[in-house]
């Protein structure tokens, strides 16, 4: 999983990529091609 400062290009890498917010972080998940996974932001305390 890559840690990126901007997810704009990450979400458009594959047509099945989705953006999900979990615990203060923004994730790009792609079930058909998991190498496109990415995350942005730090975990909230």
Curated annotation (Swiss-Prot):
PROSITE patterns reported for this sequence: RIBOSOMAL_L36
SUPFAM superfamilies reported for this sequence: Ribosomal protein L36
Keywords, comma-separated and alphabetical: Ribonucleoprotein, Ribosomal protein
Keyword flag Hydrolase: no
GO biological process entries: translation
One of the record's GO cellular component terms: ribonucleoprotein complex
Molecular function via GO: structural constituent of ribosome
Pfam families named among the record's database cross-references: Ribosomal_L36 (PF00444)
Domain of life, source organism: Bacteria
Family statement: Belongs to the bacterial ribosomal protein bL36 family.
Protein name: Large ribosomal subunit protein bL36
Organism field: Aliivibrio salmonicida (strain LFI1238)
């Amino acid at each position: 999983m890559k840690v990126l400062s901007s997810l704009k290009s990450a979400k458009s890498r594959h047509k099945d990529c989705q953006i999900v917010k979990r615990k203060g972080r923004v994730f790009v998940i792609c079930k058909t091609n998991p190498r496109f996974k990415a995350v942005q932001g730090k975990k909230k305390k």
